[in-house]
């Protein structure tokens, strides 16, 4: 049976299966590359095939409580298992070759990453982006994650799964990785790129500072928080409108539809994590040259020579006062012992 036969179009009904959501989609927008996403049915029909590996992107403890039967774990959340301690990709690609080969992934393997909820959605997209950066052309994400699997009436298993080792060789696709020098050139007006800031509005405005300085990259094209590029729904428990952990073409088109798909387009955030979701949306929409900026604001905002729009400095004096107050409270508590 062919891949096209197995892959079923993702409909609004599939989104409604996620449980506590209630929203209306027009269905006007369609993904240009829909096969990057898979449905529970596709996973169920293929998971036991030797050339398919399904990766649970949650913590090992969550995996042990219940996972898709046949799915493997990388031992920790994907965004930690696939990057170094500074949340950056390993530049030594042999580490990826060893890691993926050990869990049974070869260059001919269809790899499906899935998440548990909104918190781990970007773990799956981190995995997706890294594999595309490594040149793997058979990588997918289970849209709706574990919730979609459950709502489709499928069972979970708590038995650990280990695949036979395989050989994986990286074929780096450098264009998927945006270096800081490229962003700096855009900020200084020397290079033209479409920059998507996937941080929150407060981060963009410098009101939420997560580096030495807050603010934004000059010449940024658009600021769309990663949550704002998802469909919204009414949470029946809280009564509030919230983003749904489901990649929806209408929501993505609303966020990025006015951008030029033929131009190089780079997504970034604070650590290059949230922006991997934006990167995947760009791939789904058919952007010709999308990239993720791995170093993102955490590196840029701490480089004092780099230009910043709406620049705001971190209040170290205020932090020092808070620390002194805390020290006094601790001293009092210790004195009572």
Where are these regions (language model features)?
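Bacterial N-terminal signal peptides
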Residues: 11-22
């Amino acid at each position: 049976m062919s891949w096209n036969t197995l892959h079923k179009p993702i409909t609004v009904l599939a989104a409604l299966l996620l449980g506590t959501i209630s929203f209306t989609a027009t269905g006007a927008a369609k993904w240009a590359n829909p096969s990057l996403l898979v449905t529970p049915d596709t996973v169920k029909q293929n998971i036991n095939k030797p050339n398919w590996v399904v990766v649970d992107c949650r913590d090992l403890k969550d995996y042990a409580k219940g996972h898709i039967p046949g799915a493997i774990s990388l031992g920790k959340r994907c965004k930690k298992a696939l990057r170094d301690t500074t949340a950056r990709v390993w530049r030594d690609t042999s580490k990826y070759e060893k890691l993926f080969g050990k869990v049974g992934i070869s260059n001919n393997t269809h790899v499906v990453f899935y998440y548990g909820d909104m918190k781990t959605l970007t773990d799956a997209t981190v995995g997706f982006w890294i594999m595309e950066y490594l040149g793997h052309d058979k990588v997918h994400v289970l849209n709706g994650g574990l919730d979609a699997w459950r709502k489709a009436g499928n069972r979970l298993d708590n038995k650990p799964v280990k695949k036979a080792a395989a050989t994986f060789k990286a074929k780096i696709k450098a264009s998927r990785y945006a270096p800081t020098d490229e962003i700096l050139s855009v900020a200084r007006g020397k290079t033209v790129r479409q920059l998507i800031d996937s941080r929150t509005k407060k981060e963009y405005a410098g009101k939420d500072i997560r580096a030495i300085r807050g603010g934004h990259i000059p010449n940024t094209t658009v600021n769309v928080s990663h949550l704002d590029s998802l469909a919204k729904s009414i949470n029946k428990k809280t009564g509030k409108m919230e983003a749904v952990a489901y990649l929806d073409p209408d929501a993505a088109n609303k966020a990025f539809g006015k951008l030029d798909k033929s131009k190089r387009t780079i997504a970034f955030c604070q650590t290059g994590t949230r922006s991997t979701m934006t990167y995947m949306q760009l791939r789904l929409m058919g952007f010709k040259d999308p990239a993720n900026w791995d170093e993102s604001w955490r590196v840029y905002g701490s480089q004092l020579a780099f230009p910043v729009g709406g620049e705001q400095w971190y209040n170290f004096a205020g932090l020092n006062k808070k620390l002194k107050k805390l020290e006094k409270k601790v001293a009092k508590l210790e004195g009572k012992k």
